[in-house]
From Swiss-Prot:
The gene is Ifrd1. Disulfide bonds: none annotated. Pfam families: IFRD, IFRD_C. The keyword Cytoplasm does not apply. Could play a role in regulating gene activity in the proliferative and/or differentiative pathways induced by NGF. May be an autocrine factor that attenuates or amplifies the initial ligand-induced signal. This is Interferon-related developmental regulator 1. InterPro entries: ARM-like, ARM-type_fold, IFRD, Interferon-rel_develop_reg_C, Interferon-rel_develop_reg_N. Keywords: Developmental protein, Differentiation. Residues 1-10 have a biased composition (Basic residues). Belongs to the IFRD family.
Length: 449
């Protein structure tokens, strides 16, 4: 068909400008006609998002961060956005609910909003409960993450205990559900461990949670013993999260319970060091170092029977040169197991320094390192801000009350981009000179002869 004879082509020139012509041109200009069912879930979510576009973008919290919120937005604007996100957790569309949960998680991770969360904790808990029960994998992961940052915001107390009593059984059910998504189970394991660390007040419930995690990661024991049993990588990821959550909760257990767990797992955990997954090997090594630290804290003359075989295995991992493994994995593994070997043999820990604002925190033990790594995994880039202002985290890491600084002082402490560039350039030159002295110079011999 010739181009000038195309069907539904708009007329050139000024035809009779009636309403039907305008409607026809608008329909044809927009592409093929799409039949839309009245009052469908898709239309409802689009309409809701259009009305709530001012506060429904979860990425704005991740991009702006706490500094921009302080400078450009007021507390009322932030609370208005959060109220809109809370309302969107009840939307019919799963994508809208997930986006709202992610926005809440980003906002609560990057800002301390104790009063706001305290007033709306029941509404938030109901929304999280509904999303955990009826949502799919991604929505469950987002809901579990919001539950953990909700407890971090409130800290230990009656309010967090009520949240844990409501959401704890649901999280535990998802973790133990073999038909659920591995990713959802993994996230729920980490977040459930954090919530229990903060809010648990019943010692029997703490022991029950430990047993729940043990039932999961001990399946890797069986896998290592029985060569006929094969476990897929996603299952190993769940076992890693359960092991790390179990180790975190072990740090707050009474001494008698810690001794029982040490007797039960001390001689089985080394079997995980031969796992094919590098992250499992690292998690097992760091957990062993932490267990040694706890055991020696209870008994200074603690004796481990299989010390020779364990140190031999740790030394092999600290100097691993297996060609069948990726260079990045080998480099990461060697770095971790050098520290683990030093902790087991010499009772030494390489102190790390964490800077946040004008303050510094020294991580000088495996217990402190594991606790810091866990909360950093949950809070992400908001960890530094929470270390400055969150009273609960400051109590956990023994930082004292928050240091109060006004906006002018904080602004003067900031380094400009140009100054950072000069500092990085100078550091790069100094590092290059220092390394050049250690490099082999034999290749240059005879070049100018």
């Amino acid at each position: 068909m010739p181009k000038n004879k195309k069907r539904n082509a708009p007329h050139r020139g000024g035809g009779g400008g009636g309403g039907s012509g305008a409607a026809t041109s608008a329909a044809t200009a927009g592409g093929p006609h799409r039949t839309v069912q009245p009052f469908s879930d898709e239309d409802a979510s689009i309409e809701t998002m259009s009305h709530c576009s001012g506060y429904s973008d979860p990425s704005s919290f991740a991009e702006d961060g706490p500094e921009v919120l302080d400078e450009e937005g007021t507390q009322e604007d932030l609370e208005y956005k959060l109220k809109g996100l809370i309302d969107l957790t009840l939307d019919k569309s799963a994508k809208t609910r997930q986006a709202a949960l992610e926005g809440l998680k980003n906002a609560l991770s990057s800002k301390v909003l104790y009063e706001f969360v305290l007033e709306r904790r029941m509404t938030l808990t109901d929304s999280i409960e509904r999303c955990l029960k009826k949502g799919k994998s991604d929505e469950q992961r987002a809901a579990a993450a919001v539950a953990s940052v909700l407890c971090i915001q409130l800290g230990p107390g009656f309010e967090s205990e009520e949240i844990l009593k409501t959401l704890g059984p649901i999280l535990k059910k998802i973790i133990c559900d073999g038909a659920a998504s591995i990713q959802a189970r993994q996230t729920c394991a980490t977040c459930f461990g954090v919530c229990c660390f903060i809010a648990t007040d019943d010692i029997t419930e703490l022991y029950s949670t430990l047993e729940c995690f043990e039932n999961i990661f001990t399946k890797s024991y069986l896998k290592e013993k029985d060569t006929n049993v094969t476990c897929s990588t996603p299952n190993t990821v769940l076992h890693i999260s359960s092991l790390l959550a179990w180790t975190l909760l072990l740090t707050i257990c009474p001494i008698n319970e810690v001794k029982k767990k040490l007797e039960l797992h001390f001689h089985k955990l080394p079997s995980l060091l031969s796992c094919d997954d590098v992250n499992m090997r690292i998690a097992a090594g760091e957990s062993l170092a932490l267990l040694f630290e706890l055991a020696r804290g209870m008994e200074s003359d603690f004796f481990y029977e299989d010390m020779d075989s364990l140190t031999q295995m740790l030394r092999a991992l600290a100097t691993d040169g297996n060609k069948h493994r990726a260079k990045v994995d080998k480099r990461k593994q060697r770095s971790v197991f050098r520290d683990v070997l030093r902790a087991v043999e010499e009772r030494d820990f390489p102190t790390e320094t964490v800077k946040f604002g004008p303050e510094r925190m020294y991580i000088d033990s495996w217990v402190k390192k594991h606790t810091y790594d866990t909360f950093k995994e949950v809070l992400g880039s908001g960890m530094q801000y929470h270390l400055q202002t969150n009273e609960f985290l400051r109590n956990v890491f023994e930082l004292g009350p928050p240091v109060m600084l006004d906006a002018a002082t904080l602004k003067t402490m900031k380094i400009s981009r140009f100054e950072r560039h000069l500092y990085n350039s100078a550091a790069f030159k100094a590092r290059t000179k220092a390394r050049s002295k250690c490099r082999d110079k034999r290749a240059d011999v005879g070049e100018f002869l």
